[in-house]
């Protein structure tokens, strides 16, 4: 049996977090997801663990008497913005010396999915490469998380990256505006700016999560090289030395800054995460600092 994507200890820590959106969309609730707890006459949907600072009025005291543990009752107050996680499963995500980018990316996707489900968000896990794969849809609480985790565990890498085609098909498949979290290395022969702008123009709020292996940014190679493109199979021969490495790293950083500017220009957010950073540290560090979760 494969190891779980997210262990139980981290899941409990994730219950403190909320996926945060900045836009207020007509007919849907925007901003902080804090209105989901106690409220007389509201529809009960789920429980979560009590954390310091939570409202004691929302505690299920009957559960406390039976289990000697504090749980908060959660209620659905209004329709919520859909949270859609676009997960890159193209061949380039297979690279990475210490665990590939794909394994790392789907752990991030699992964590974001759990945060959303605990807060009663409507979640869509949408894999893509040169086209959209089958999606997983869930809402209504943490009891759906195991199904989501199984879905992510069973995903297979394949295909080249076609951001524009994936974005076009995504808009057609999910016309309702919402929050789109893209988890990818963003390595596409075509410029990623146009498809990201396309998503924003249709009213979606963007959170761009770029993951890379250390060797993506600072290749350890030296000498005469014959490199093969992981997605197309094309070969290129080149000489690589410390000067070429410095130029390459500078170009990589410039591209990351370009993605950041694309996100900010469209009132979205960007976070870049090397896979050498532990997943828990990435969640409570860069992703929290970016405002994607809080």
Question: Model-derived features: where do they sit?
Answer:
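An amphipathic, basic-hydrophobic helix/alpha-beta surface used to engage anionic
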Residues: 1-139, 179-183, 189-190, 194, ...
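Short coil/turn segments at secondary-structure junctions
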Residues: 93-97, 154, 243
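Short, contiguous clusters of charged residues that form electrostatic/catalytic patches at enzyme active sites
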Residues: 107, 111, 161-168, 257, ...
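Conserved phosphate-coordination/catalytic loops
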Residues: 103, 157-164, 250-253
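Von Willebrand factor
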Residues: 144-178, 190, 212-213, 217
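Short, electropositive alpha-helical surface patch
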Residues: 136-150, 288
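Von Willebrand factor type A / integrin I
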Residues: 1-36, 172-178, 188-294
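Short, flexible loop segments at the rims of nucleotide/cofactor-binding pockets, characterized by
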Residues: 62, 156-160, 184
């Amino acid at each position: 049996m494969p190891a779980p994507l997210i262990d139980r200890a981290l899941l409990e820590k994730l219950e403190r977090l909320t996926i945060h959106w900045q836009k207020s969309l007509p007919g849907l609730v925007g901003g902080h997801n804090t209105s989901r707890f106690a409220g007389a006459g509201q529809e009960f949907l789920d429980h979560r663990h009590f954390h310091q600072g939570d409202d004691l009025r929302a505690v299920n005291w009957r559960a406390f008497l039976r289990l000697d543990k504090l749980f908060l009752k959660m209620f659905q107050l209004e329709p919520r913005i859909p949270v859609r996680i676009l997960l890159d499963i193209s061949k380039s995500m297979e690279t990475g010396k210490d665990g590939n980018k794909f394994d790392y990316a789907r752990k991030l996707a699992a964590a974001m999915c759990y945060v959303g489900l605990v807060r009663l968000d409507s979640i869509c896990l949408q894999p893509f490469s040169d086209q959209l794969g089958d999606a997983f849809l869930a809402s209504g609480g943490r009891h759906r998380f195991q199904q989501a985790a199984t879905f992510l565990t069973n995903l297979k890498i394949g295909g080249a990256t076609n951001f524009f085609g994936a974005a076009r098909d995504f808009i057609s498949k999910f016309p309702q505006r919402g929050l789109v979290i893209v988890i990818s290395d963003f390595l596409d022969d075509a410029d990623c700016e146009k498809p990201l702008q396309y998503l924003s123009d249709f009213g979606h709020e963007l959170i761009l999560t770029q993951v890379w292996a250390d060797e993506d940014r600072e290749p350890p190679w030296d000498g005469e090289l014959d490199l093969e493109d992981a997605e197309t199979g094309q070969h290129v021969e080149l000489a690589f030395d410390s000067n070429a490495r410095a130029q390459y790293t500078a170009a990589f950083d410039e591209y990351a800054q370009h993605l950041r500017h694309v996100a900010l220009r469209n009132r979205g957010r960007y976070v870049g995460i090397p896979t050498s950073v532990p997943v828990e540290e990435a969640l409570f560090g860069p992703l929290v600092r970016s405002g994607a979760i809080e």
